[in-house]
């Protein structure tokens, strides 16, 4: 029978438990309310099935010059230009890929009416890098969002 010294077993046991947090990933760590880098809006990220989505829950300027709630006036689809910006689902179909990354999603920019491929990375508990791009990720722009409310 093989005899393994007690000290080796103890060290192996401690290493296994010390490494456990490195492998345990919180797929839902992204859930909550996030403020855009410009500070002009907040998006609530939520989960539907196994994918992640986001909707506008706050706008710095919620109303147009006439005092009416702002709408999606820059949307290329004319029939959607009257929908309110507040409540608009502007993030969709993100998949958790490990290493604090959610990818293969889409982001809609109501300022331009454009829809982009998008990846997101949680760099710390309260900082989210949101990268919108056309085609490949190197042809894009990254915005840094800050957590406002964590999902309870």
Please provide the spans of the model-predicted regions:
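Residue-level recognition of beta-strand termini and adjacent short loop/turns
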Residues: 98, 124-126
């Amino acid at each position: 029978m093989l005899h393994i010294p007690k000290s080796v077993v103890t060290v192996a046991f401690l290493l296994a438990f010390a490494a456990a947090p490195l492998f345990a990933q919180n797929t839902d760590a992204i859930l909550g309310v996030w403020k855009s880098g410009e500070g002009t809006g907040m998006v609530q990220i939520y989960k539907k099935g196994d994918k992640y989505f986001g909707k506008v829950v706050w706008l710095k300027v919620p109303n147009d010059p006439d005092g009416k709630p702002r709408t999606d006036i820059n949307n290329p689809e004319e029939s959607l230009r009257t929908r309110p910006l507040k409540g608009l689902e502007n993030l969709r179909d993100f998949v958790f890929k490990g290493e604090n990354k959610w990818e293969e999603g889409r982001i809609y920019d109501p300022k331009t009416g454009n829809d982009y491929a998008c990846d997101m990375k949680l760099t710390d508990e309260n900082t989210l890098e949101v990268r919108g791009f056309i085609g490949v990720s190197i042809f894009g722009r990254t915005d840094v969002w800050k957590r406002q409310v964590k999902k309870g």
